[in-house]
């Protein structure tokens, strides 16, 4: 997949995931939020909790999941820490990391709290 096609496919996947969160009462507060450590695809809120969402698109959900590396997770953690620094409770803000997997047919599988140890 060329860079431009891949970029647009990623945007389409992110939009589909954002709609799911919005419709389930967890409004998306930011898209492609960028900090010094990296970028977070989507940031949603569920009450006082902040949800950091990494969207992965590939031919299958399994292939999409395989594209998430430890290094990428570390960058997301760093960017999330930067985002939380701007919250009233700072690092004490309730938060979680979800991964949204999108397959070639546009089907979405959301893994809540995916980065839990």
UniProtKB/Swiss-Prot annotation:
For this protein, the record's Pfam families field holds:
UPF0102
Q: Which InterPro entries match?
A: Restrct_endonuc-II-like, tRNA_endonuc-like_dom_sf, UPF0102_YraN-like
Give the Gene3D superfamilies listed for this entry. Answer: 3.40.1350.10
What molecular functions are annotated in GO for this chain?
nucleic acid binding
Q: What family does this belong to? A: Belongs to the UPF0102 family.
What PANTHER family does the record tag this protein with? UPF0102 PROTEIN YRAN
Output this protein's name. Answer: UPF0102 protein RSKD131_0118
Species of the source: Cereibacter sphaeroides (strain KD131 / KCTC 12085) (Rhodobacter sphaeroides)
